[in-house]
Amino acid sequence: RQTLSGFIQTAVLLLAEAVDQLILQAFRKDDYAVKYAVEPLLEGSGPLANLSVRLKLIYALGVISRDEYEDVELLVALNNELEQEKTVYSFTDDEVLGPISMLHSMTALPPPPTLHMPEDVVDDALRTMQEQRYQQMVRSALVLSITDLITRLENKKAF
């Protein structure tokens, strides 16, 4: 089973690839320009080596919408936070639900499970099953949201 941190990290890598393709479309295509101008900008310590800077550039050029820009920025920030935290979060923790509910590409999150039974009737197995089901529903909604975002970015043309 993939962890939340691994999931978000993979999503950010896929988003970075889509952003990179848009950046490359924005520059001249001749070999000389690519080798001596474009590559130094994008590699190592170049000014466009950072994903956040590349993202700002394609947003400023009007290649992506504000919603797309904000969604990628939010996922990058969540990824950075998860990498620095010592705590292992799940898809349904409040620290995760808050940020992902702000994604423009996210349809409404599924409601948390409510057991309409008296407390003494509900056993731990049922509660655990409901929590696992809710985790999977949130994960699925996030997969669909991120897939939609990546697809939209990959289908864009820089100019």
Spans of features found by a protein language model:
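Amphipathic alpha-helical interface elements
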Residues: R1-F159
